[in-house]
Amino acid sequence: MPAGKIYARRLTVLAVSAALTVTGFLATAPSAQAAMPTPVSAATARTYLAALTVKAEGSTSGYSRDLFPHWITQSGACNTRETVLKRDGVNVVTDSSCAATSGSWYSEYDGATWTAASDLDIDHMVPLAEAWRSGANSWTTAQRQSFANDLTRPQLIAVTDNVNQAKGDLDPAKWLPSRTAYRCTYVRAWVQVKYYWNLSIDSAEKSALQSILNGC
């Protein structure tokens, strides 16, 4: 992927989304649940959706999760997963290695609440394999690492582990959160991430996204 194109896209997103702020690393967990960065509005998501390249989904040939290095160190002893667990939880306590030893987490996808970090996965809103089939196969390793550890866009969220596993690498034409109240947020986030990272969509994916955005 030409570096100039993706960086130009990033500048456009920054201009449109100037109100969004990056969730910072916290030395101690907040007393109330934080959240992933707020997605763009439905109106902005519809504008982004119209600008995305629509084409048949590519092949998974050559794909490996190892081509998207994660989880990388974010601050001190904390890697990306641990940072998201602290951000998304309530009263999270961590040990000296930054592993969460206690806390409470609400899974937006299914409405379940968990008190053990082992019951949670950190979901890539746009899955790594989906990104690969949508253009990330041509990225550099550095670009794929940035995508896989992106804390600035609404790309990473702590959710029930088996729900994340059921989602797998499916796009919104084939999978949506069972908690219908979250679907508008989900597709707004999906579109924002795809737009920022200059990833394509297929026709069925676009139809599913458009249908939900029209009801937001």
Give the predicted meaning of each segment.
Residues M1-A35:
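Secretory targeting and sorting signals
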Residues V54-L128:
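Secreted/periplasmic proteins that engage bacterial cell-wall peptidoglycan
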